[in-house]
Each structure stands twice: as structure tokens, then as C-alpha cells.
UniProtKB/Swiss-Prot annotation:
Result, substituting L1039F: In a breast cancer sample; somatic mutation
SUPFAM superfamilies per the UniProt record, alphabetical: CRAL/TRIO domain (SSF52087), DBL homology domain (DH-domain) (SSF48065), PH domain-like (SSF50729), Spectrin repeat (SSF46966)
Domain DH: 619-822
Top-level taxon in the UniProt lineage: Eukaryota
UniProt tissue specificity: Significantly expressed in brain and modestly in pancreas, brain and testis.
Domain PH: 834-954
Ranges in a coiled coil: none
Pfam family, one: Spectrin_5
Name this polypeptide is given: Probable guanine nucleotide exchange factor MCF2L2
Organism encoding this protein: Homo sapiens (Human)
GO molecular function, one term: guanyl-nucleotide exchange factor activity
Function summary: Probably functions as a guanine nucleotide exchange factor.
GO annotation, cellular component aspect: cytoplasm; cytosol
Amino acid sequence: MLSCLKEEMPPQELTRRLATVITHVDEIMQQEVRPLMAVEIIEQLHRQFAILSGGRGEDGAPIITFPEFSGFKHIPDEDFLNVMTYLTSIPSVEAASIGFIVVIDRRRDKWSSVKASLTRIAVAFPGNLQLIFILRPSRFIQRTFTDIGIKYYRNEFKTKVPIIMVNSVSDLHGYIDKSQLTRELGGTLEYRHGQWVNHRTAIENFALTLKTTAQMLQTFGSCLATAELPRSMLSTEDLLMSHTRQRDKLQDELKLLGKQGTTLLSCIQEPATKCPNSKLNLNQLENVTTMERLLVQLDETEKAFSHFWSEHHLKLNQCLQLQHFEHDFCKAKLALDNLLEEQAEFTGIGDSVMHVEQILKEHKKLEEKSQEPLEKAQLLALVGDQLIQSHHYAADAIRPRCVELRHLCDDFINGNKKKWDILGKSLEFHRQLDKVSQWCEAGIYLLASQAVDKCQSREGVDIALNDIATFLGTVKEYPLLSPKEFYNEFELLLTLDAKAKAQKVLQRLDDVQEIFHKRQVSLMKLAAKQTRPVQPVAPHPESSPKWVSSKTSQPSTSVPLARPLRTSEEPYTETELNSRGKEDDETKFEVKSEEIFESHHERGNPELEQQARLGDLSPRRRIIRDLLETEEIYIKEIKSIIDGYITPMDFIWLKHLIPDVLQNNKDFLFGNIRELYEFHNRTFLKELEKCAENPELLAHCFLKRKEDLQIYFKYHKNLPRARAIWQECQDCAYFGVCQRQLDHNLPLFKYLKGPSQRLIKYQMLLKGLLDFESPEDMEIDPGELGGSAKDGPKRTKDSAFSTELQQALAVIEDLIKSCELAVDLAAVTECPDDIGKLGKLLLHGPFSVWTIHKDRYKMKDLIRFKPSQRQIYLFERGIVFCKIRMEPGDQGLSPHYSFKKTMKLMTLSIRQLGRGSHRKFEIASRNGLEKYILQAASKEIRDCWFSEISKLLMEQQNNIKDQGNPQFEMSTSKGSGAGSGPWIKNMERATTSKEDPASSTGGIKGCSSREFSSMDTFEDCEGAEDMEKESSALSLAGLFQSDDSHETCSSKSAFLERGESSQGEKEERDEEETATRSTEEERAGASTGRLAPAGATAGFQARALRPRTSAQES
């Protein structure tokens, strides 16, 4: 690029010429001897206590006159000094060097004024004094005092300047010619002080403007001369237009300045122009000379800048011509760079025959695609050579471009030749490896098909041995190279990965051959023991268990070598069989299976032994074991998403399957799933493994990682956006390819909901540990041994382990609640940013709401008002009302919420209503002017909400009372006949529902607490899975429910509007009519909204869907 190339024309010439102009302006205006300007002392000059009339003495000395001024002695010293300094700096240096003649007119003044004038002149006159003429005071007494004073002080003034006392102007004319004196002194010199001040001010302003303009042109020229040349034609055109506009602006200023100077010069010469007989005084002549010299400097400034601009404009035009080459060069280089980048993406030699063949096809396409860019690049290099030969100013910049183009072309052509050779070798390399792998897989499947129960007879053994011998004979059909020959032929291709793969394949060949040998030995031994009865111990291969790693599974008597198949009930299974780690496990497990095959008659059934060992474990250790096993499966599932969906997005041969919207939003689709994987794989799993032998560390593990687990909140905060992207892109071919490659039966988004299910699993396991503590941590009441199992053992109150478990459970439940809140609030539009200040979300659900304003309506008119349907959220410190809208989506109508208002609890009161309102309660503002009547779907929901709000209000009231400043009141219905009775009753009922599992499950549906756990849940590992499904169905909604979470329950549909209008009052009327019809439907037994009672380990909110509830009850 030419961005680093500076314009070659130096600005020294322009800078030098303009600097000369500035210096000349300073000399003309005598800037060195005139520190002040007229505009700075304009007020002092207008007072006219001293003037420079323009008169001269006989020897040309300038005359400064001090006219009669009554307040002369009151003039500040600074003002006097400034005026004297300015007046003495105006005459030329030659005239000032002669000396100034001072004429002091004090004919009407006193001796004191004469003395003050002489004293100030003697002390503060900045110029060279030649003579002082004093016109004596005309009155006799003052003249006498003046004569005496002059005689007395003459010696003092004599040493500094000659003083001549004159009695009248006629005496003064004997010393100074009348033509050099103003009319006040009896002369004929025309002097107008206001005009003189205006001329001086205008001349100085003109000189200052000229100087400033010259400096501005200097700066502008430097900027233009040092500016970097642009990199494109459009940029060059823009730069040229910009510079031209700036130049035109400066040129206009120069022209305007020239007109101003010409006008000022005309004004100064006006007296002589109007009256040819009149002559200009010396001051006026000096002003004319000054303006003429300044105009000459202005003309010089214009010439210097015009010359510079012509060269700069020519340079920009040449640059614009250069940009044609630069533009073509950029396009050609970009095309070559893209070709080289695509070529560089083929650095891999392929990891399979299909991959290599695909690379060869793409490489051929790339070669065909490169023909046109190569021709253009070579032609452009020839154009560059022509520019160099034409002595272009940027020849040094063009020459490297031509060289670069030719080098890029040569690099690409040579790289293609080298690629063809390497890929040809790689294709043969992988074909050889595939031959070995195919033979090994065929052998493995042969071994897997030889079931144990078929080898119980001599005939079955002979058939198996014959099959093995036949298969080993087929090795002649595969011209396999020896390892030494293999490495010698493909030595250049053996990178670390290729070498590792070759070693694995060849090692697998050795392992399979060894397995065949052992199988033959085993079958021969088994044939010799046919007299002993053999009990079959393994099913057929088609019903054998799925492949699991030897780290997490017990040895089996079968040989599960086939690729595992997933079912919809098992979202967490092993991923691929083609990884090297699993191939090693496969061969090792095969060897181990031979030993089991050989000795299974001499020991009992291993599955029964495994069950016996599990039966020996305590419930606590079984739960820890379940936690570890599911944790490993969870990590592997996340890893499969990363390796199977995220990583392949960068594969060039799959890019055509990925739509742009998915490519641009892949980070939002997967969120921070990599962060989840790193945390669980590197940190959390290792800490959980330490709990296998010491379960007491489990709770501490969760508490220790409380902050790290907040990554789940970040994940779920992004989940709604991920769902939207998935719904838009779920049908693209890329997901289908990845799903088939991973052998997943479920789509991707089912696995993306795995973190949500994992949090539920943690919650259930922690609840299970609380219900199944070891005997040393329990106290069993002997009288309860015959009771129901659901009552469970009593926990020791001082058990530290139990306390930590409860704290850990609270951490997980709070995390689930915060995650669900993040998703729920994502559906609320126009939600304020400070909603987090209201604290934790406790309850939320749909309600019918009546609004009453006391100053507008009466209670007796209540029946005329129809309810509005609102989604209400109860937080620790406030209530949020949201409007419900049903909007069409991909799966039909779905609810959407819009924020309406927020009410702080500390400003509210609550009361129950009278008879006939068993589903309603009222909340009101503290002043009672604004009231809301809320109708729930059932009495149980009403009681739960009323109890929870009452509890929060009482807590806040107690806190305020402790501070001595109550801020709210609570009232009860007059019809109830009790003061706080309904509060206490509802609170007791809510407390009972939390503590009694039977009453909880049979009472308020949707309140998530620990009653859904029972001792029967954790009798075995399968029970934990059943409990997870049950808890998920009963406790979670929206975020944690199944993939059809966009569907809503029937009760919720009854609350939602079918089509809201945004037309003001009509919208509300339609909404209320719909709500009235919906209210009738709710009485049929609609399910509740999401409820989450607060407590020490408060659960998260839940939506109790009717189908799932019935399933749980069954």
C-alpha cells in the first residue's frame, strides 16, 4: 500500500517565503519597539491628554502635544506610560532617533499641573526628548508661581531636558513653524483625533490579519505537504476536493483582505484626493507608506501560496493517476491473497480417503478459479513497468508492487504443483490405512457375532473356529505393507498426527490379530470342556448394552464393539467410536472379554455381583456414585457438542452447508458452553471425585464453587436468543450432517438444554442426601419405625453436614431461580433496567385485575368494571404488572409480556375480600387512592400469594418498627370480623403446605419445595432418573421444560388475550371482555401460575402443567 509514502514536495519554499512576509510585517509595524496596539489602549487614547499630531520640528523631530486637560494629574501612571509608549513607537526609527519635541499647553491651568506634567515626563517618558515647550498659565498669580517654580526646579529638569517657557502661541511660533502646529496652538495643521485613532486601529488590525493569514497558510501548506497519499481513487478524489475547498476558502480570505487594505489606503488618502491642493501631514504619509508596504506583503503571500498550490494540485492529480494502478493492484493482490489463503487452508493432507478426495476436488476448483486472477496480475505488472519507464514520481513505490505481484503468482503456481504431489501421496497413504482398518473392523464384527450361547456345543465351536480361519485367509486379498515398508514410502507425510494415526492403525492390527489368536485358544479350551454344562451369560449382539468407557462401566461378558445407538430416553451417551482413546479401550476390552469368556464358568454372574456390590453401598454413597457417573456423561455430552457442532463450522468442506445467519450468530447459539465444559472438566469433576470416599465434602464443594456456578446464569441469559436462532436455522443441512456424524437421535437444542437439566439433577441429589443421611448423622425415633416411609428419619439439628447440605441446596435452588428469571424477563418488553433492585423473584402467574381509583369511582360501582388480564411477578421488595399478549409464532400463538408498572411493597397494604370472593384479594396504596383487586385461578393460589405478601409486609413492618418509623398499614376486610386473623391463618396454612408433603402435593400445585422427594426415590440408580423426570415436570417451566415449551397450558390460555388492540380505551374494553369470558373457564379447574415460596432454601418458580401433574400423582 502507498499509505506510508509521503508527498515528496517539501514545504520549505512556501514556509520560507511566508516567514519572510511575517518578518516584514513585524518590521513595518515596528513590533519590536511597539509592544502595545491601539485597540488595547483605545480608551486612554480617546481621553486625548496627549496627541501625535504629525507636526515636525525644523530638524524633523516629531512633535507630541499635551493639550489642556484638567484631570491630567489624576491620570494613572500606567495609562500615562502606555500612551507615551504607543505614541513614541509610531514615528519611524530615523525620526524617533532625532528626539521628540513636547509642547505642554497649560494656559488655563495652574502651576501644580505644570509641575505634575514636567515630573511625569521627566520620569516616565520612554522616548528620546529634545525640547519641552511650556505655555505658561495666563493668570497672573499662576504665572508668578510658575516662574518661581521653574527657577526653583530648573536645575532638576536641566540635567534631563531643556525647558523653554513661552507666554503665548506667538512666542511658540518663533520656535516651531505654524504649519506644524494644530489650530489649538495657532497653527494650520489639520488634525482630527478620532480619525487618527480609527486609522491606526484599522492599520494595525490589517497587519495582524495579514500576519495571521500568512501563518495560517504556513500551517495549511505544511499539512498539505506532509499529508499521506490516499490508498484509493475515491479517497484521492475526496482529498483533492477537500484541499480545493480549503484552498478556495483561504483564497477568498486573501482577496477579502486585499479589498480591505485597498479601501483603508483610500480612506487615508481621502483628504488629498478630495482637495488636490491639500497635502497630507507626515503622520498620514507614514500611514500611507505603511499600508502600501503591507499590501506588497499581501501580494507576496498570494504569489507564494499560488505557486505552492499549483505544485500541490499537480501532485494530487498525479496521485489520482497512480491510484488507478493502486486500485487495480489492491484488487489483484486481494484476489491472489484469497487464492493463497484458500491454498493455505489445504495445508492438511487429509485424515481419510474421502477427506483427501474432497481436498483434491476443491484444489482442482481452486486451480480453475485462479486462471483469471493470475492473468490480471501479470498484466498489471506490465502496466506498472510502463509507469516506471515514464518517470512517474512514485516509481519507487510502483516497482515493489510489480515485484510483489510476480512473486505472488509464482508462489501460487509453485504451491499448486507441490500440493498435487503431496495430496497424491496422502491419498495412497490413507488408502493403505483404510485397508488395514477395514480388515480389522471386519474381524471385530466377526468376533462380536460369535455369541457365547452358540459356542456351548462342539459343533458351535467348530463353526466359530472355521469362521476365524476363513477370515484370516482373506488377509491375502489386502496387499498390506509391512510397517518398515509403510514408513519408508510415506516418510515425508508422517506429521505428528499422521504418524500417530498410522501407529494406532498398525497397533490395532496387532491387537486384532492377538485377539483372534486368543479367541482361537479360548474356543479350543472351551471345546475341551464340553462335558461341563454351560449357562449362557450374555445376550446376542443385537441386544448387547451400549458402548461405555471402561472407566465408567463394569466388565461385561459380551463384546460390544458395534457403534452405539442412542434412544430418546438417553440423551447422555458416548459419542463416537472412531477416536483413538475408544479404539484402545475397544481392543483392551476385547482382550479382557476373552479372559471373561474363558473363565465365566468358574465364577458367578458378574451382573449379579455388581448389583450385590451396589446393594452393599449406603444410600449416600449410591447418590455420590450416581452424581459422578452422570457428571462424566454430562461432560462428554458437552464435549460432543463442541467437537461435533462448533468445531466443524471452521471446516472448509462444510461451509457451504452453513447459512449466513448461523455463521454470524454461532456465538449466540452456543453461548458460553465452552466455559461450562472447561469448568466441569478441569475443576468441578475433580472436586466431586474427592467426595466419592468422603461424602461430607460434597456440600462444601458446592458452596466453594458458588461464584463459579454463576456461569449458568450467563448461559441461561443467552438461551432465549439461542432458541430464536435455532428455530430459524434448525432445518439447515449442517445440523443434519453433524447429528448423523455424532449418531445423536435428538436434535441439537435438546442437548443445549442439558445445563438446565444438570442444575435439576444437582438439586435432586442434594435433596436425596438430606433424606438419606448415614446413621451417625441421624436420630431415629423408635416409635416411628412402623410409620410411613415418606415421613423419613429426623435430621439431627446440630449436624454440621446437614447444615452445609441445606446451604448447598439453597445455593442451587437460588441459581435455578435466577436462571429462570433471566429467561422469563427476556420475554418482557420495555422492562426497566433497575428491576433487579426489587430482589429475588418469589412468585409469578396470571391474574384478573380490577383497578379502582377512590377519587373517581365508588365501591358500589365495582360490578360495572371488567377485569384486565395481567401477568404479575412478586419480588422481595415489589410487585410488577405486565400486560399479556398472544402473538403468532412458529408453533401457533405464544404469550408475550409488556411491562406496565411497578409497586413497592413498603407502600402497599393487603386485605382479603368478603364472602363470594374466595379467589380474590385486594392490594392498595398506602393512601388508599389506588386499589387493585386480584383474582387468582383457584383459592389455593390466592391463599399462597396472600400468605407470601403478608409475610413480606410483616417483615418490612417489623424492620421499620425497629427504627421507630412505621411507613405502611395493613387492613383486613370488615366482613371477616377479625383484625389480623386472616393473615395468621393464611401464613399457618402456607407454612403447613411447605412442611407437610402430603398437604403440599395435594394443595397448591406449582409450589416447588422438598416434598417431591421421598425415600423410595433413591432406592436405586434408576429411581434417581425417575425422580429427575418427575421433578422436572412438576417444578420447571419455560426454561427447564421440554422443547415444546412454547406451548402453554390450558389455564394460561384462559387468561391470555386473543387479539389486543393498541387503540386506547377500546383495547382495554376488548381485553376486559375477553378476561370475563376467560374467568368462567378458569373455574373448571385451571392450573396455577408459577409459584416459588420463599424460605431458607426457597425453591425456584414452577408452572404446574396439568398433564405432568397427573403423571406425578399416578
